[in-house]
Amino acid sequence: MTTSSSGSVETSANSRPGTFSFASASFTDLLGGNAGAGGGGVSRYKAMTPPSLPLSPPPVSPSSFFNSPIGMNQADFLGSPVLLTSSIFPSPTTGAFASQHFDWRPEVAAAQSADQGGKDEQRNSYSDFSFQTAPASEEAARTTTFQPPVPPALLGDEAYRSQQQQQPWGYQQQPAGMDAGANAASFGAAPFQATSSEMAPQVQGGGGYSQPQSQRRSSDDGYNWRKYGQKQVKGSENPRSYYKCTFPNCPTKKKVERSLDGQITEIVYKGTHNHAKPQNTRRNSGSSAAQVLQSGGDMSEHSFGGMSGTAATPENSSASFGDDEIGVGSPRAGNGGGDEFDDDEPDSKRWRKDGDGEGISMAGNRTVREPRVVVQTMSDIDILDDGYRWRKYGQKVVKGNPNPRSYYKCTTAGCPVRKHVERASHDLRAVITTYEGKHNHDVPAARGSAALYRPAPPAAAATSSHPYLPNQPPPMSYQPTGPQPYALRPDGFGGQGPFGGVVGGSSFGGLSGFDDARGSYMSQHQQQQRQNDAMHASRAKEEPGDDMFFQNSLY
């Protein structure tokens, strides 16, 4: 509005000079004073004003306050073309005044009798009228900037008026509801985002879209996990990672599949935690999503059923990774298919059982690692005799070595020692033997020891250096009297033994190691040794003694 600090303005309606000075009266107060003096037309116009106009005066501004001099009627001032020209509410900031008088009160009466379409048209034409002053306060500007308008159709007329009266109005922002065509898109989008935030993606500050946090999957379930493997499975484009609970002797495992962008697509658990959830776990901002998964996991445990009746942990009703869990049904987390977990897992890892190489829990929850000894020997044969008895239970080819690795277990009952034997990749003559664990028993007697199979010497010959005297005939072998179910061979492998005796209620020299189960440990060397002992005993009987030679020479 082009006004000066002091001056006179000559109008066609009133030829009296007037001097304008700035005071505390506002434009709203002038409209209210004219309503009391001039009639009811102004009150009707006041009812048509935008509902967002403040009822309290704004701060002091040179361009928004003026005062009429003494003796000048406010009704005459409102009829002056200084404020209004021949058009309906043009901008008074052009500085050009019309030459003819214009009274806006008949226009108000005509506009009040028009229909709703006329009001919308008048509002559209009124949208050009705006003050170019600074906002009343920064708080008001922020409020009007970040609060989206809500259409009257969704709120109702009364609620819409009350909301518009409560919202502050800034001069730099176009009043809500003035331009219905331009804000049509915002009227439809704002309520959808306010009421359907779960269906529509949330808009981040940078303009990107992020999935709602309630729909994200997180691997943080409150327990501590250690990753021990990852591979690409058949039928899935996402890699699969394998985790094991770090608590000592806890059998719980899980596998996690992630997409290429890092999002978790599937989490499958196996086993039940045998301990409470640790307190000092590392939590992040996604802990709320983990709580959602925990509640869903408890439902999954009660729905599908776990392996035991103990308290359920998050999504623990599913399965592990096919190492030694054979034939265990494992419904996947999130569905009730009940498909087998071990369908695509290799069978070559069944030798590794739970807790192998992981340590033994001692008093005070201390974990003691099992000792591991690696021995390298240059040999042409794979089987090396170390004094213990072993049973082979597996073989596979490991990464980095084309030579197969064989796995053995100590045959002594209750002994936890295992070993695996393989040839080095750089030298085929080098045999690498790795021992895990410690024997809890003594070294068994050697298989080739004759003391296992020889009977105790007689009491009369116990003091002699040789168990048999030179002139004593060899003991007769045991001759079975019943029918012989096995053929006896004279070559020492199935024939009669040189020493008779009964061990444990059964004859010991009658049948060979190939025919008797007790003789499975007898080797060819032992048979040969027995034959040699028998031959030496027979020669001692046949050869004459030295005393007989001297007696014959005397005669």
UniProtKB/Swiss-Prot annotation:
Motif, Nuclear localization signal: chain positions: 253-259
MF (Gene Ontology): DNA-binding transcription factor activity; sequence-specific DNA binding
Subcellular locations according to the entry: Nucleus
Start and end residues of each stretch annotated as Disordered: 38-65, 132-248, 270-367, 471-498, 513-555
Chief localization: nucleus
Induction of synthesis: Induced by abscisic acid (ABA) in aleurone cells, embryos, roots and leaves. Slightly down-regulated by gibberellic acid (GA). Accumulates in response to jasmonic acid (MeJA).
Basic and acidic residues bias: start-end ranges: 347-356
DNA-binding region, residue range(s): 214-278, 379-444
UniProt-annotated stretches for the region Transcription repression of gibberellic acid (GA)-induced promoters: 466-555
Lipoprotein found in the keyword field: no
Keywords: Abscisic acid signaling pathway, Activator, DNA-binding, Gibberellin signaling pathway, Nucleus, Repeat, Transcription, Transcription regulation
Pfam families according to UniProt: WRKY
Expression by tissue: Expressed in aleurone cells. Mostly expressed in aleurone layers and leaves, and, to a lower extent, in roots, panicles and embryos.
GO biological process, one term: positive regulation of DNA-templated transcription
Bias type Pro residues, positions: 51-61
Biased composition (Polar residues): 277-294, 310-320
Gene Ontology CC entries for this record: nucleus
Biased composition (Low complexity): 163-194
Its job: Transcription repressor. Interacts specifically with the W box (5'-(T)TGAC[CT]-3'), a frequently occurring elicitor-responsive cis-acting element. Negative regulator of both gibberellic acid (GA) and abscisic acid (ABA) signaling in aleurone cells, probably by interfering with GAM1, via the specific repression of GA- and ABA-induced promoters.
Family according to the record: Belongs to the WRKY group II-a family.
Free-text note regarding domains: The WRKY domain is required to bind DNA.
Protein's recorded name: WRKY transcription factor WRKY24
Organism: Oryza sativa subsp. indica
Lineage per the UniProt record: Eukaryota, Viridiplantae, Streptophyta, Embryophyta, Tracheophyta
